[in-house]
Curated annotation (Swiss-Prot):
Protein localization: Mitochondrion
Protein name stated in the entry: Meiotic sister-chromatid recombination protein 6, mitochondrial
Keyword Oxidoreductase: no
Note: Present with 7250 molecules/cell in log phase SD medium.
Organism superkingdom: Eukaryota
UniProt entry tagged with the keyword DNA repair: no
Amino acid sequence: MLSHNALRAFDCSKVIISRRCLTSSTSIYQQSSVHLQETDDGHSGNREKHVSPFERVQNLAADLKNELKAPDSDINEVFNDFKDKIESLKQKLRNPSPMERSHLLANFSSDLLQELSYRSKNMTLDPYQVLNTLCQYKLARSQHFTIVLKYLLYNQSPQDVIALWVKYLETISENPVILLQNSSSRAHMQNIAITTIAYLSLPENTVDINILYKILQIDRKMGQVLPFNMIRRMLSTEFSSLERRDVIIKNLNTLYYQYTVQDSDHFLSQIENAPRWIDLRDLYGQYNKLEGEKNVEIISKFMDKFIDLDKPDQVVTIYNQYSKVFPNSTSLKDCLLRAVSHLRAKSSKEKLDRILAVWNSVIKPGDNIKNTSYATLVNALTDSGNFNHLKEFWEEELPKKFKKDPIVKEAFLLALCQTSPLKYDQVKGELAETVKTKKLFNKVLLLMLDDEKVSEEQFNTFYYNHYPSDGVLPPTLDTLSIKMYANYKFQAEDTRPQFDLLQSVSINPTDYEKVEKITKAFISVCPTVEPIRQLYKQLGTHLNARNYADFISAEFNKPDGTVAEAKNLFSDFLSYQKTRKRNVDNTPLNALLLGFCDKLYKSKHSEYVPYIEKYYNLAKDSSIRVSNLAVSKILFNLATFARNTQQLSDKEVAFINQFMRDLGTNEGFRPNPKDIQILKECDGITVPEKLT
């Protein structure tokens, strides 16, 4: 029997546990060996026709499912029938493995639990009793616990949730193969999220992330963390009507703040690996609104990453907010310097003036200019297109001691790599034993892969010198994506089609968040489309809309990509979306529109206009939002095409006029006046007065 002692082991004896959920939690089974054996039903002369154990289980599951789905089904009778038939089958099977591993039986059990969760208020039977029976016969899966945990939380029983979580951990320890390997990995994370919400909703509870880690048995040393995004989504959707939800949200923010303080390295890694600016914006928004003292290193990391994702305006906003909190922070000033080099400007000269203004007014007045500031100035001059000014600065103004400084030297070497077609042979002699700058390290890796004289052994020696295979120092996903491509490149031609890309860098395809991030990074580093297509095939069902958009963009951007394959990918996405039973996500369609706009701009061929029209109309007919970026690209390319074409066809004129009418009603978009003026001067084109 579980008791309060079960939780004292986790140093959280303050938690009160309901007796109802603690019953029947004794260890009830042992690990079984896995060998399918023929069943012998007796020695009578009238033997039944042989039926394999697998077929017996499948037939039983099908019968039970039909019984449950029948219009006049009595759920109590179904459950009793289930117990009787399972016991009978267990007696007939010499080896229960086919029963324990049956997906059909697991699916029926999920249906039974779900049905009972909806009906149980007026019934003597409840989901917990069913789950207990599943555990007794070693049929329980993670998703079965998920259903019951949700049921308990819906019914405002947080203590029962935590008690059931303890039973879940016991069941895992007793039978990990059956419970976890035959379950959805997402179900396990959901169980963690539900238990966390239950912990946050305990009355008179002082939130302590260390106590929660012990309850959940999360090992920070192994990089395990709480699924905060999943928790927030659950509180916004299925648990939005929970009592004391405001208290839960407040407690969650406290928990999140404790995480950013205690697990700051992991949080910094999260920022570093954010694949898109919208993800980074959400992450920053969560951190920015937290109560408590902020970490300047974290703020600086956000600023750096916003620049990498081409959002320098956001960096200026952050600087204006936090420069008052951290007035002497060199890192904030360095980020501002780098940000102004990325702000839009009419010329590189205008960018140079901004850089010098920040350098002279913000950084130079300090008593002691640091090496990081000189390195940032090198980066800023390079990124702004002022490399000639950088060479002059390096030769005439930079103090000699900083020319030998590793950080400054690496910044200059990276600038050379970015502005000149250097080969690996030209760079390797300038490298220190250890490269400190991640961007330079990644650039060197790519130069090595571009050099046919570099062997796999040389590449791996350089790579593992910086990121040992023991995983103590994990690489960024950008770096890992380069390693994944290297693993593919160094395979023999005849073995490449069978090569498992994700497995080669130890990434589980069911880790959707990590897969999404590394997919985008991998696509960006691949010089050809072939390994990208191979990754697409290997991902199979482990894709989301953003992945599809990235793969579609690759077909337009890579030298050997094709329009036909981009269209096929979009068709695959539409089929995938039907199975999700959700509104169609707009990112793949926008990727397709942007791709055709790019083709039209580069080729000047009219054959791409009908494609733009087709998919633009599809978006309208399907109520899919066309992004402002895609709208602006369509407008620009139609205007450019119309200006360069002697005579537009009737169909082209009709589409452009339709597009202009739509533009006139689009309140959320401001067109470029130059594009509007070009179209006004074209024969047959009517520009709505609102746009002029």
